[in-house]
Amino acid sequence: MTRVKDPEKLPDATGVYIFRDRDDRVLYVGKSISIRKRVSSYFREQENPRLRIMMRHLESIEYILTQNEKEALILESNLIKRYRPPYNVRLKDDKRYPFIKITDEEYPRVLIVRTIGRDSARYYGPFTDTGAVRRTLKLIKSLFRIRSCRRMDGPCLNSQIDLCYAPCDGRISREDYREIIEKVDLFFQGRYQEVIEVLEEEMKEASERLEFERAARIRDQIESIREVMERQHASFTDSIDQDIVALERGGDTSAVVVLQIRDGKITGKDDFILRGSAPRTEILEAFLKQYYAIPRRVPSEILTQYPVEDGVIAEWLSELRGEEVKIHSPEGGAGRRLLNIAWKNASVILKQKGRVRDALLQLKDDLKLPEIPRRMEGLDISNIAGESATGSVAVFIDGKPSSGSYRRYRISAQGPDDYAMMRELVERRYSSPELRKPDLVLIDGGKGQLGVALEALKNCGVHVPVVGIAKKREEVYLPGLSEPVDVDDGALQILRHLRDEAHRFAVKYHRTIRDRDSLESELDGIRGVGPVRKRALLEHFGSLDGVRDASVEELASIPGMTREVAERIHRHFSGDLAG
């Protein structure tokens, strides 16, 4: 890369330019068919206050020449992702969104990941709804029985309860397994009808070969996929593939919503927050470059709220898709109606974001924090008289739950000693020097719990702001103050939400541990019920009460369960212990 200070020394050629400050930090990355003309324009434009601030910090300019504008676009996108310059319009915190990964192993797995590796695996995402991704992955595994184990050391629990084809045990050929993975691939592309057509052909062949059990299984797969399709109830007459992209801007923050239409049905919605002050068309183009730079299915048509003036974006997307991609902004008709739906969603998201931002600012003032608490962690303990004690950490980023960052702990402290349990939780959470430190720690409890948490943090050598919130009167306590502090309603609402999330997560884990222990103890004396069936019962029915209330037919329907053992379990809980 070549570096200059005088813009007149820049080449009149296509490429990428990089603004750096006196500490060599990257301020901004851009592309142009004429680097000299584009960079010179920054020195003339003085209306944008954000631009004026950037130019005051500018110390040097680097440039990289490319053969054409498409190469420049790809390089610009990669450099923005690498350096995350403060003055570029960019997706906020995009790393925390999950992806679906289909691995490139001999027998591929399907995983949820948060980064894209430099490998030949297939990735889908990012997805903004982590819960929906987990539910979808669970459905995929139950439908297609793909492997989950990292190592193929032999048959595992899933193969024993008929949830995996067990390629580790040679029960399925590589070719047959790859055909299953291709169906999974189509599913994540939203091409449900194609999956159904393939499965219907397989069901027909199985019936002709008198493989009725296999045919019935395929029939159930088809019904499950049709249920997914029915949930995507909004549909159109044309079987089209489109992305509908609309944005709403407020100050230096913009919300963008993408409606995904596959085979004429709305199959998904993604929403993103972008940082950076720029004209709406520039924000839109910056979003498109970042959104599609991540491996994902590119539709044949992209409808945008404003015309996209940079023609190289469509050229680049067409190359990614392998055929022409049209980007246009319809004036009316169904396309404009869809854009209005996306825009209304973006407007609501931006308003909510504004309210949360105001509440975080108020929280900073009310709690006398050194900075806005962008990352907050709430800690809670759940137990009954010291039994099955668990601890949880809920994480909020910019006022919203980041459920993928939640953590839970099995507490080893003995007896009903809440202080000892909180001390253990804090020390286990913050003892690692690699852990990202939060801007605020919230303890579910009053002055006593707050004092214990402070002491534990001190033992860990961690110095972060800590507050406690008492359940009884929703009072907020700061270290060193005997009386609770006044907190604005909006700010208090965020603290309550964080406290409630930590409590919910701790209680959920506590119940899981308690039910598992109770179920294992209750089933110990029943002949034919070993560890595998115990786990299958808990996973299927969720609790001891669920097993107790189940009929013989429901018990027998669990994969790997015989009717004889199901009847034995049912008799046990009915009070008839014979047999």
Swiss-Prot record:
GO biological process entries: nucleotide-excision repair; SOS response
Keywords: Cytoplasm, DNA damage, DNA excision, DNA repair, Excision nuclease, SOS response
PROSITE patterns referenced in this protein's UniProt entry, alphabetically: GIY_YIG (PS50164), UVR (PS50151), UVRC (PS50165)
Pfam families: GIY-YIG, HHH_5, UVR, UvrC_RNaseH, UvrC_RNaseH_dom
Gene3D superfamilies: 5' to 3' exonuclease, C-terminal subdomain, GIY-YIG endonuclease, UVR domain, UvrC, RNAse H endonuclease domain
GO molecular function, a single term: DNA binding
Endpoints of the signal sequence: none
One Gene Ontology term, aspect cellular component: cytoplasm
UniProt cross-references to InterPro entries, sorted A to Z: GIY-YIG_endonuc (IPR000305), GIY-YIG_endonuc_sf (IPR035901), GIY-YIG_UvrC_Cho (IPR047296), Hlx-hairpin-Hlx_DNA-bd_motif (IPR003583), RuvA_2-like (IPR010994), UVR_dom (IPR001943), UVR_dom_sf (IPR036876), UvrABC_protein_C (IPR050066)
SMART domains linked: GIYc, HhH1
Residue ranges annotated for the UVR domain, each copy included: 193-228
Residue intervals of the GIY-YIG domain: 12-89
Subcellular location as annotated: Cytoplasm
Similarity annotation: Belongs to the UvrC family.
Quaternary structure note: Interacts with UvrB in an incision complex.
Purpose: The UvrABC repair system catalyzes the recognition and processing of DNA lesions. UvrC both incises the 5' and 3' sides of the lesion. The N-terminal half is responsible for the 3' incision and the C-terminal half is responsible for the 5' incision.
NCBIfam families membership: PRK00558.1-5, uvrC
Protein name from the UniProt record: UvrABC system protein C
